[in-house]
Swiss-Prot record:
Family under the similarity heading: Belongs to the saccharopine dehydrogenase family.
Protein name: Homospermidine synthase
Catalyzed chemical reaction(s): 2 putrescine = sym-homospermidine + NH4(+); putrescine + spermidine = sym-homospermidine + propane-1,3-diamine
Required cofactor names: NAD(+)
Gene name per UniProt: hss
EC annotation from Swiss-Prot or TrEMBL: 2.5.1.44
One GO MF term: homospermidine synthase (spermidine-specific) activity
Keyword NAD: yes
InterPro entries reported in the protein's UniProt record: Homospermid_syn-like_C, Sacchrp_dh-like_C, Sacchrp_dh_NADP-bd
Length: 477
């Protein structure tokens, strides 16, 4: 595609925080799809490598870390420079999403991020209990800010591939499933209507089911963590507690599972790191696989969004929802090495598009427990297709950067929506913008269940009355 649409004009400054793998991939999409004054675009990152890359693209660059102490002094002049509404694109680690979001809104600037990120030190603070380090707790801080200051300038929270795009996939998958099950009616337009549809369809749960098969042209070196996206981000979330949205149909809970005393009540966490917690899941390419139950915002937000409550406010329906992530093989080996040694590797490396020889990132949602058993809907984006349609990123990165693009388009078209999550956005508009960057987007039914081939040669603690119980999904051997 050579005739790319220019969606809108951004009249004010564009301030991009972070220029790692996602920032470098997002910048060319901003340049391609928006009209703006190039002199008003600035990138902020503490890395000298990032400075060289930004300057090579002719972009103004500030080599500085955004911290709790300097963020106001640094960002306010940039976001308010000259006429027009500013746009803050926060793609960094170790910067408080909430603080920067509120600062942007105070100054009338639009805002978007891909995660509810805390300030540096939060993830590895030994004084914080597991519950305090959870994504549930981080999300609740954003929800509290929305309650305290409803409406106002739009800020889109958690709008990458996942969290983000997968929330739009869930809605499309529900629409497809309804059609295939012969359930008629108007397409939902409210949260309550979407939740009722999921309940009426009998969806017991949703896996964010992903398989990354991208391979490098060289073997993983010893004591180097290799991944296809931010190693810092993956390690940080991987060492948070495993978390999931907890469905109303579940009859068993792990002994080390804990709930929350406040907030939406949609999630639980386990007293173990997500990147060392395995679950059984399925994607079209790998088919049955083990994935890591890494905590993600969408595990809680989707479960919360699809909750049906009675007149007394009690949840009568909620699907279980969690990530089931099989990263690239080098990252799996890196996790094994990290947990085995009991410490982080001395170095890390993000595989870029020039180092990957082949593979896809197959990322979608697996809706299960309904009348057709299980339905996977998602993107099968290859590295070859990625190179053809977008510069400076691999397949994993493009699924994220194109979701940021879609969220920016939605924010510009809805500039006074207040604080929103990806679940709140118009999924059709967002997928209209994003789909050209996703490769094949497919829906596949499967008769696989977590009880396939079980029990095997050894006795297992399983629930044969309901294959989709979390008791059967969680790998406990």
């Amino acid at each position: 595609m050579t005739d790319w649409p220019v969606y809108h004009r951004i009249d004010g400054p564009i301030v991009m925080i972070g220029f790692g793998s996602i920032g470098r991939g997002t910048l060319p999409l901003i340049e391609r799809h928006f009209a703006f004054d190039r002199s008003k675009l600035v990138v902020i990152d503490p890395s000298d490598e990032a400075r060289k890359l930004a300057e090579a693209r002719g972009v103004r660059f500030i080599q500085q870390a955004v911290t709790r102490d300097n963020y106001r002094e640094l960002l306010v002049p940039l976001l308010t420079a000259g006429p027009g509404q500013g746009f803050c694109v926060n793609l960094s680690v170790d910067t408080s999403s909430l603080d920067i979001m509120e600062l942007a809104r105070e100054n009338g600037a639009l805002y978007i991020d891909t995660v509810v990120e805390p300030w540096l030190g939060f993830y590895f603070d030994p004084d914080l209990k597991p519950e305090a380090r959870s994504n549930y707790a981080l999300r609740e801080t954003v929800l509290a800010a929305r309650r305290n200051k409803p409406g106002g300038t739009t800020a889109v929270s958690c709008c990458g591939a996942n969290p983000g795009m997968v929330s739009w996939f869930v809605k499309q998958a529900l629409v497809n499933l309804a059609a295939d099950l012969g359930v008629t009616g108007e397409e939902p337009t409210t949260r309550e209507e979407w939740a009722r549809l999921a309940m009426d369809l009998g969806v017991k749960g949703i896996h964010i089911a992903e398989r990354d098969t991208q391979r490098a042209s060289f073997p993983k070196p010893f004591d180097v963590f290799v991944n296809t996206w931010s190693v810092e981000g993956f390690v940080s979330e991987g060492l948070q507690p495993a978390e999931l949205g907890w469905g109303t149909f579940e009859r068993w809970m792990p002994d080390n599972a804990r709930g929350h005393d406040s907030g939406c009540g949609a999630g639980i966490y386990l007293l173990q790191p997500g990147a060392n917690t395995r679950v059984r899941s399925w994607t079209p390419t790998a088919m049955a696989q083990y994935g890591f139950l890494v905590t993600h915002n969408e595990s809680i937000s989707i479960a919360d969004f699809l909750t049906v409550r009675d007149a007394a406010g009690q949840a009568v329906y909620r699907p279980t929802c969690h990530y089931a992530y099989h990263p690239c093989n080098d990252a799996v080996l890196s996790l094994h090495e990290m947990f085995g040694s009991g410490k982080r590797q001395s170095d890390w490396r993000i595989l870029d598009e020039t180092e990957i020889v082949d593979g896809i990132d197959e990322l979608g949602v697996l809706l299960y427990g309904h009348g057709k058993n299980a339905y996977w809907y998602g993107s099968q984006l290859s590295i070859e297709e990625t190179r053809r349609i977008a510069p400076d990123q691999n397949a994993t990165g493009l699924q994220v950067s194109s979701a940021v693009l879609a969220g920016m388009v939605w924010a510009l078209e809805n500039p006074n929506a207040g604080i929103v999550e990806a679940d709140d956005l118009d999924f059709r508009r967002c997928l209209e913008v994003q789909t050209p960057y996703l490769g094949p987007v497919v829906g596949v039914y499967t008769d696989w269940t977590p009880l396939a081939g079980r029990p095997g040669l050894f006795p297992e603690d399983i629930d044969t009355s309901d294959p989709w119980q979390f008791r059967n999904v969680l790998v406990r051997d």
